[in-house]
């Protein structure tokens, strides 16, 4: 009987460990962006990954993510989406949203919080609805222990953040 309870307990712990892991996959959803008081852009977004190849983050308007990363030679590697901040010294908080006024698009805003003791440098590509393609854009580095807001007047359906590094 003792062996049975031990086996049940070990099985429970193993199942809990497997299913309690932070998920890198976003479920499919409907992306809706306001254009003006009468028009909206809508698209079905399929199930996809937040972090691609351990170094690229893709986020959509309305998403807020917690990203942990390891540091190797001033480069951020092994990016991982986590469900909450359990390691504040290595977890970036990143949010992307649309700002509207009276149902009319005003601008898109990216918020990024740098938990590191050095400046955070990164690159951004934005997918502009106007052109239907990815465009590289300039962003400011985020000071150590601070946060930044980036804003664009264009309608952006998604952004890619990559080339994360720490600089003096």
Placement of each model-derived feature along the sequence:
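Intrinsic-disorder/low-complexity, polar/charged segments enriched in Ser/Thr/Lys/Arg/Asp/Glu/Gln
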Residues: 107-109, 147
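Short, hydrophobic/aromatic beta-strand segments
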Residues: 120-125
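Short, solvent-exposed mixed-charge patches
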Residues: 167-168
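Intrinsically disordered, low-complexity Pro/Gly/Ser/Thr-rich segments with frequent PxxP/GP/PP motifs
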Residues: 48-72, 129-164
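Bacterial Sec-dependent N-terminal signal peptides
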Residues: 1-24
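Surface-exposed acidic loop/strand-edge motifs in secreted or periplasmic proteins
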Residues: 28-107
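Asparagine-centered strand-capping/turn motif at beta-strand->loop junctions
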Residues: 110-118
């Amino acid at each position: 009987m003792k062996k049975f309870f031990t086996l049940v307990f070990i099985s429970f712990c193993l199942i809990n460990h497997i299913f309690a892991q932070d998920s890198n996959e976003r479920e499919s959803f409907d992306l809706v962006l306001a254009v003006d008081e009468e028009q909206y852009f809508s698209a079905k977004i399929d199930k996809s990954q937040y972090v691609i190849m351990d170094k690229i983050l893709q986020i959509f308007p309305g998403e807020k993510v917690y990203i942990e990363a390891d540091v190797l030679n001033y480069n951020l590697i092994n990016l991982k989406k986590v469900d909450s901040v359990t390691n504040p010294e290595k977890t970036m908080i990143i949010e992307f949203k649309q700002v509207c006024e009276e149902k009319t698009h005003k601008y898109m805003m990216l918020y990024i919080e740098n938990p590191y003791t050095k400046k955070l440098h990164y690159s951004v590509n934005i997918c502009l609805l106007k052109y239907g393609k990815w465009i590289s854009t300039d962003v400011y580095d985020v000071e150590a222990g601070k946060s930044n807001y980036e804003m664009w007047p264009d309608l952006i359906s998604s952004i890619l953040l990559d080339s994360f590094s720490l600089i003096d």
